[in-house]
């Protein structure tokens, strides 16, 4: 055993071969000794031997150049999948070591981190010892989880209403939602507590209610007027129950609920039916006769329940005659925000109960929603509620977009009607955007576009500009943000089809473009990339339980500068093979810095004496010192580098010297031949 330093830790570890040889070489078991040189003045090293009786180490790892230590790595290699792997990253190489037990790994990691000065060693090793327990289950009890989720829910409600959709994450599981109800009722206004009391009586809808109570709490609380109007239902919580009854999961199953609940659940704008029970307006049978309860309707009801699309798609999939349901939708939105009595007469005040004549739809001012322009009052409320759509989750937006596009698909005949009569209007642009089906000239096209708008971050500001302008114009919300911007600025809508059609085509084109790129990937470089990936996969990689410790940058720089010289001498003692190459390269720094040779760099001139003498001739005409450093690199490289780096005078002088040598040799050789 080689001495030098106090022994801190010893034991058997399996060592990885170099990264480039992981596929060909085996992981061999070696005897490791960790030595600390603080007391003796020697460097801190980690040595490994062939066995515990060997006297000469196979390699000495200088820990002064240790940059990082990772514990708890994961390895895909079969024989090492369940092993305890940690690594030591140095400036030269990364050593992957495998311990037999987790305690051994923690012991080695803690010792190495203490020697290297990693302050995080103690608390990280403590956390490493608890890795198994942390991986099997959460440490907090369900009560703590519920309390924390309640706290987050309360904060998000009060401070960040724009993210109020996030509390739904805590209400997917019934146990958490049961704990949340008292907290929600205490933190929410009194009106919302009343809704909770109503929904608590519905045991069969617990799953839907558990989700929607968080969503409805978060989204309805953003509109105080909406909550107040819901609470003014004279004891009827139908509207509140409707949102909580269907949630996300009970939407396709309206048959489970009563007529009241179905009306309010599947057609919230039409839930005038629910308001009608209270205010004496629309009846449930009226909405039932319209076959409203299609599968696509619930997603739009979900948007309305979020306080966004209170006036949009709900009536579109009801029947092919969905145009005359829009007045009721807008009338409900007016009732929902202003609590006016929504009677069939009120709906007739806006557009007639039947689809408007083609002459109304030809107004190029409002574009595709030909039925909506007369409802400037109701469209005002739409514009007021639509900007909230930006706070919807992306998942909800995608659902709404899919549902609304399906709704539009059901009415191609209306697309044909409006395609002929609105060639110069915005519906032509919509028709080019969704060919053959989207030119619905009414809320069909508008609803699918409304569902797509939440994905545009700037839609809120554009909608604000629309509200400042024409109210009926704000009803139409195109899917494309560029076209929407032109519409809000009042530009002629006839120019939009040119932009909208190609833009949609460009969105469809990327798959073919990607397919065209695939043949290039199948070229010769592909196997090389796959080979590189396999090599990377064969390396241990970090997992969620991996803990890392690294040295501070300034500490490492100071240590590296302090121990810059020992690395060359260290490599001499580490291995016999390749010592001359390892020593020859770093020893050039002393040669270039000072002409005085040292004892360690003496072997270098012996091996390449001719090249050194030849370069010495190149140094003579050069007075400034900066030119010497580039020339020293030519000791191990080709002489052409010197000709590129030196100036013309140096090059000419060197050529003259070479010519003189050749002349002398040529003149001396014939004379020798003559003497012979």
From Swiss-Prot:
GO terms for biological process: osteoclast differentiation; phosphatidylinositol 3-kinase/protein kinase B signal transduction; positive regulation of cell population proliferation; positive regulation of mast cell degranulation; signal transduction. Phosphorylated on tyrosine residue(s) by the thrombopoietin receptor (TPOR), stem cell factor receptor (SCFR), and T-cell and B-cell antigen receptors, gp130, IL-2R and IL-3R. Phosphorylated upon stimulation of TNFRSF11A/RANK by TNFSF11/RANKL. Phosphorylated upon EGF stimulation. Phosphorylated on tyrosine residues by HCK upon IL6 signaling. Dephosphorylated by PTPN11. SUPFAM superfamilies: PH domain-like. GO terms for cellular component: cytoplasm; cytosol; membrane raft; plasma membrane. One of its GO terms (molecular function) is phosphatidylinositol-3,4,5-trisphosphate binding. SMART domains: PH (SM00233). The modification Phosphoserine is found at residues 2, 133, 140-141, 148-149, 159, 164, 210, 218, 223, 264, 281, 285, 368, 405, 422, 425, 480, 543, 622-623. Residues 6-117 form the PH domain. A motif (SH3-binding) lies at residues 351-358, 510-519. Residues 159-169, 556-577, 589-611, 656-670 have a biased composition (Polar residues). Keywords: Cell membrane, Cytoplasm, Membrane, Phosphoprotein. The keyword Cytoplasm applies. Its main location: cytoplasm. Residues 140-149 have a biased composition (Low complexity). It is found in: Cytoplasm; Cell membrane; Membrane raft. InterPro entries: Gab1-4-like (IPR046355), PH-like_dom_sf (IPR011993), PH_domain (IPR001849). Coiled coil: none annotated. Adapter protein which acts downstream of several membrane receptors including cytokine, antigen, hormone, cell matrix and growth factor receptors to regulate multiple signaling pathways. Regulates osteoclast differentiation mediating the TNFRSF11A/RANK signaling. In allergic response, it plays a role in mast cells activation and degranulation through PI-3-kinase regulation. Also involved in the regulation of cell proliferation and hematopoiesis. The SH3-binding motifs mediate interaction with SHC1 and GRB2. This is GRB2-associated-binding protein 2. It comes from Homo sapiens.
